[in-house]
Amino acid sequence: MKEEKALIGVLNGEKRIPPPIWLMRQAGRYLPEYRELRAKTGSFWTMCNDPEMATEITLQPVRRFGFDAAIIFSDILTVPYALGQRVKFTEGEGPSLPPITSADGLERDSEIWRQKLAPAYETLQRVRKNLDSRTTLLGFAGAPWTLATLYGSRSWRGRTESCQALGIS
């Protein structure tokens, strides 16, 4: 009989003692093994786009703490990147994207999307293969408004045009 994952069981209405545990930002500044890998790499975006590194970072907190779920190490800007947007990470400021002035600036070739998203797909496959049968794999996505706030400068100038071009104004 297949053992049900604790998190899935609770989401299906079961009561579990102890309850399943995970943290939304499992990989990050607090783990020494993450900090060591980040220091060697020097680039958050490189880590996101390297399936071997992203797999390792996803699994680090699960191995260390025995969490009931692993959260895939990636970034919400993976999809805008696949759409041809120039993704920029500035130390101390965070991510940004150039303003979109029309939908014409977005990549429409789905083969290019697949190529640019291939590292994310490979990371998902690697993590799934390395997780035990009791550990849930969680993903995430950026909502249109969240992504729209990253287009343009850190001020609201340029965001109105981006929102209009994306059809979310």
Regions found by a protein language model. Give the residues of each.
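N-terminal basic, low-complexity leaders that serve as flexible interaction/assembly modules and, when applicable
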Residues: 1-89
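Active-site-proximal, glycine-rich beta->alpha crossover segments in alpha/beta enzymes
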Residues: 88-169
